[in-house]
Amino acid sequence: MGLVLGIKAALIASVSCWAGGLWLSPDLDTRSNALRWWGALGFLWWPYRLLVPHRSLWSHGPLLGTTARLAVLLTWCLIVTMAVPALSPAVLLTTLQQLMRQHPREFIALLVGLEGSAWIHLILDGDPWPQEWSKKRQR
């Protein structure tokens, strides 16, 4: 990462991989250490836990799992901006777009680190594919 995008991006990827492993694990759909790390904010993952079956494509799928967890966080951020009069969902989304445009390398590094933490989790689980894919490969 450092050779391609620079040292700053490598540090961002490293920190996001660490944070992703602690707070954005594919196991947020179960009672897990990752869920406990959220403490009192663990309730934020209730809809995800309710809607996403464990080891499904949406929890453990390459790219899709990380995207789903980031979508849950973005949805909660948008809900907060709607609930707080001083904030605005449009401002949040515009700010996010500006950050992506102004700092594309850092944004890519952030996403690579988060996805990397998910892959590390999947490999440590012993089978890096969601259950749906594993069943198809066994046939």
Where are the model-predicted features located?
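N-terminal membrane-targeting hydrophobic helices
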Residues: M1-R139
